[in-house]
């Protein structure tokens, strides 16, 4: 029988550059496999408030 999806969790990514500039932060949600990716995710995503691609880090 197939195993369940207990290894995948939903995480929230928050813009780091908007915080430094004092502008509204953008947030994205995604999933990650907690067995394969134990450290926090860092992805480049589009921030509509800054109108450019910025670094988004995983928050709790």
From Swiss-Prot:
Report the coiled-coil segments: none
> In the UniProt record, does the keyword Cell membrane occur?
no
**Which Gene Ontology BP annotations are present?**
translation
Keywords, alphabetical: Ribonucleoprotein, Ribosomal protein
Q: Does the keyword Ribosomal protein apply?
A: yes
Q: Return the GO cellular component terms, semicolon-separated.
A: cytoplasm; ribonucleoprotein complex; ribosome
Pfam families according to UniProt: Ribosomal_L33
A GO molecular function held by the record: structural constituent of ribosome
**What family name appears in the similarity comment?**
Belongs to the bacterial ribosomal protein bL33 family.
NCBIfam families hit by this protein: PRK00504.1, PRK00595.1, rpmG_bact
Q: What is this protein called?
A: Large ribosomal subunit protein bL33
Source organism per UniProt? Chlorobaculum parvum (strain DSM 263 / NCIMB 8327) (Chlorobium vibrioforme subsp. thiosulfatophilum)
Q: Which gene encodes it?
A: rpmG
């Amino acid at each position: 029988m197939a195993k369940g999806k207990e290894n995948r969790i939903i995480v929230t990514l928050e813009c780091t550059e908007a915080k430094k500039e004092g502008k509204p932060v953008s947030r994205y949600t995604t999933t990650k496999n907690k067995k394969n990716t134990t450290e926090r995710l860092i992805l480049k995503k589009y921030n509509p408030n800054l109108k450019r691609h910025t670094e988004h880090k995983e928050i709790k």
